[in-house]
Amino acid sequence: MCGIIGYTGPLEARDLLLNGLAGLEYRGYDSAGIAYFNTDSQVRIIKNVGKVAALRECVNKTGDVSHCGIGHTRWATHGGVTDENAHPHRAGQVTLIHNGIIENYHQLTQAYGLQDKLVSQTDSEVAAWVLDAVYEDSGRDPLAAIRTFIKKLSGSYGFCILFDDRPGEIYAVRNVSPLVAAYTRSGALVASDLTALISYTKEYFVVPEGHIVRLTPYKVRVYDMEYNRIEPEMLEVSWNMDAAMKNGFPHFMLKEIHEQPEALRNTILPRLSGNLPDFTADGIPDELFLNCNQIRIIACGTAMHAGIVAKALMEPLLRIPVTVSIASEFRYEDPLVDEKTLAIVISQSGETIDTLAAMRLARSLGAPALSIVNVKGSTIARESDYVFYTHAGPEIAVASTKAYSVQLAALYMLCCRMALTRGCCNKAEAGQFMEDLLAVIPAMETMIGRSDQIKSFIRHLIRERDTFFIGRLSLIHI
């Protein structure tokens, strides 16, 4: 997972890129770098191992001014943590940054004879050299070159690209890996995450897969693979910049722990009719729950653990099989899935690559997909048959807190509605389930209010060599 950002416009690009990278640093902090056109329309690259603060020191030592550039913060996948492996990568006329994995990079290295050209151990540099070759072959036509280029790639990618002879322009393209873009009075922006854009605009669009985006200081254009211009669907961010700031907390994780009660309220209360769960506004019909004879929960990481808790709740109540699969393995299981299977897909970002691929497989086998996601307009949300949006706001800390809590709440509400619809409980029992769920909110506020007591307890706990966390049934998995 890496963070990427691009900007072209009237503002000073280097400061904007560095500020954007600071907001994306949770996506990677092994190394960071920027590339930009200077006042002589030459591309300059500055990159180093370490955090964005170290990069900022290097950038500030130069006297350059720029109005167009790209930036990247990295978690290493291909190649170690070195200056050479840091992005951006340059090859001939091409400078690019990349988020994703090029699975056929070795074959491309052989096919293009790149063994003696490469200065890094990354798949991304291989991609840069391939694009440079097809750029020359295309007569230096960016759209034609990028179309040819992506046909040669296997894997996931989000690219931002500078061409030496196109100062002031940025080109972007993606497959699976997330990219969002926007045009504002301050210029044109593209990034891997909304947190890098929110200071400048609340309106944005998700870059469509297999489409090319051309950013100039005055406009953003989106083209399909036949070079037809398309108008992307514009979306609006539902949270403000304060939600992406620490606001006096020492770190994002503590801030997001304190935000859990409000996140639960925002997720639960709009979906209550009387004291019963109601998904009419979400467009989730009761027929979906009546027509299934098994449930497959598909997720990764923390979201998968939320799914395991849900299985412990659902199976005894609904009396149908519930299977939880880690998304990265689902494709290799030869899963028993058909149109009578309800696939519940969980992803905070809505862009988790393995989860997206698993959902696509489940849908291809006939299963309707109901996704639980936190980001409006994300790829998983757009490709699902039905969406349950949680309303946790941005979660920036790597360790999940409020996103996990609202995922549990969403699954609990879905379980309650399924049980009511299938006759596994009556309205009084369903109402009691929801009262129990709502009681979690004040209980959580009480616990957060005891921070000083908890700190005192933790001082004793950290001295212990062994700690046992004991639970039964669903609590085991929490």
Where are these regions (language model features)?
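Short beta-strand segments
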Residues: 71-72, 97-98, 160-162, 173-174, ...
